[in-house]
């Protein structure tokens, strides 16, 4: 039983690490649109309402969803 629990924890750790890598990559892609981001509770979140014409709107939406996942699991951005 402890081995199975350890396996689950390690698997969850891999997923969290992957999410962080993807988020950091998206954040790097969006660095030119930094004016659309704000820091809220230690997380960098898009400013609401989002501008209608953002060149990286799809990337910004994906980043927003990933950061919401972090908030749900009480994880830090970095």
Curated annotation (Swiss-Prot):
Q: Which domain of life is it from?
A: Viruses
Q: What induces it?
A: Expressed in the early phase of the viral replicative cycle.
Entry keywords, A to Z: Early protein
Q: Can you say what this protein is called?
A: Early protein I78R
| Gene source species | African swine fever virus (strain Badajoz 1971 Vero-adapted)
């Amino acid at each position: 039983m402890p081995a199975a629990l350890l396996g689950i924890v390690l698997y969850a750790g891999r997923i969290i690490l992957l999410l962080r890598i993807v988020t950091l990559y998206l954040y790097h892609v969006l660095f030119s649109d930094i004016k659309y981001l704000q820091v809220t509770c230690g997380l960098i979140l898009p400013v609401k309402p989002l501008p209608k014409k953002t060149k990286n709107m799809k990337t910004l939406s994906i980043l927003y969803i990933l950061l919401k996942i972090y908030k749900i699991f009480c994880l830090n951005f970095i």
